[in-house]
Amino acid sequence: MSSSCFCKHSEETPLSVLSPELQEQFSDPNHPANLICELCRLFYDNNWVTGTGGGISIRDVDGANPNLVYIAPSGVQKERIQPWEMFLVELPEEKILRTPNDIPKELTKSYKYKPSACTPLFMSCYTMRDAGACIHTHSQHAVMVTLFLEGKKEFEISHIEQIKALPKLALNENTGKIEKIGSMEYYDKLVIPIIENTPHEEDLTDSLQEAIKNYPGTSAVLVRRHGIYVWGETVWKAKVYNEAIDYLLELAVKMQQSGIPTVKQ
């Protein structure tokens, strides 16, 4: 049986120990902290964030301060995460405004929370692409693709209907920003850069930034033998892009096993 998506805490936890402001936030199912809970449960059911792996962050693009970023902590079981367990960071200085360790112990049970090791990579997506959300999964399909492309720097696939779910991006010469100009077409070739894994997650930052810079048309970066980072202009766009890319990665694995090229000649 799959787990419930929404963070059902109203009858199980004493939210009265929180400030009125936080009580209001955590009672709103559309608040970024609750959306992270919802998506973590969904991604867990898809085997993308098992064993405390992976991570997600959401920028409050629809809130009073769109520079606020909510980030799931490191080393927690994603399917059990609660909204008060998020780190709150403000862009562009990347200042930490609140941590789960600031929350009353009645809720956190004195657990010592650590910031996500993905934080500098998430911040790169926000500052370089003005993303509204960034998702990091340990998808087996992502890992498998990087294994059969050992030594290659790119994943490519074309002429698959699902490609239409992904954005077509281009550099705006006036603003200097990468902007969405439409959606990819059936005949377009999707190219996702692959970077090499490192012993520590934060050490991936430079490689990820270089890939984002060198591939202006991408909404994702694969990490060999590790997983994938996907971002989008809103949390729901990032979710769609992640799902579409994972579908294409799974299909690519099966095509490889059947001797079918992923790019139609």
Swiss-Prot record:
Pathway in which this enzyme or protein is active: Amino-acid biosynthesis; L-methionine biosynthesis via salvage pathway; L-methionine from S-methyl-5-thio-alpha-D-ribose 1-phosphate: step 2/6
GO biological process: L-methionine salvage from methylthioadenosine
Cofactor note: Binds 1 zinc ion per subunit.
Active-site residues per Swiss-Prot or TrEMBL entry: 161 (proton donor/acceptor)
InterPro entries, per database record: Aldolase_II/adducin_N (IPR001303), Aldolase_II/adducin_N_sf (IPR036409), MethylthioRu-1-P_deHdtase_MtnB (IPR017714), Salvage_MtnB_euk (IPR027514)
SUPFAM superfamilies, alphabetized: AraD/HMP-PK domain-like
Positions with a binding annotation for Zn(2+): 136, 138, 226
Annotated compartments: Cytoplasm
Transmembrane segments: none
UniProt KW keywords: Amino-acid biosynthesis, Cytoplasm, Lyase, Metal-binding, Methionine biosynthesis, Zinc
MF-aspect GO terms: methylthioribulose 1-phosphate dehydratase activity; zinc ion binding
E.C. number(s) listed in UniProt: 4.2.1.109
Matching NCBIfam families: salvage_mtnB (TIGR03328)
Family: Belongs to the aldolase class II family. MtnB subfamily.
Task of the protein: Catalyzes the dehydration of methylthioribulose-1-phosphate (MTRu-1-P) into 2,3-diketo-5-methylthiopentyl-1-phosphate (DK-MTP-1-P).
Full protein name: Methylthioribulose-1-phosphate dehydratase
Gene: MDE1
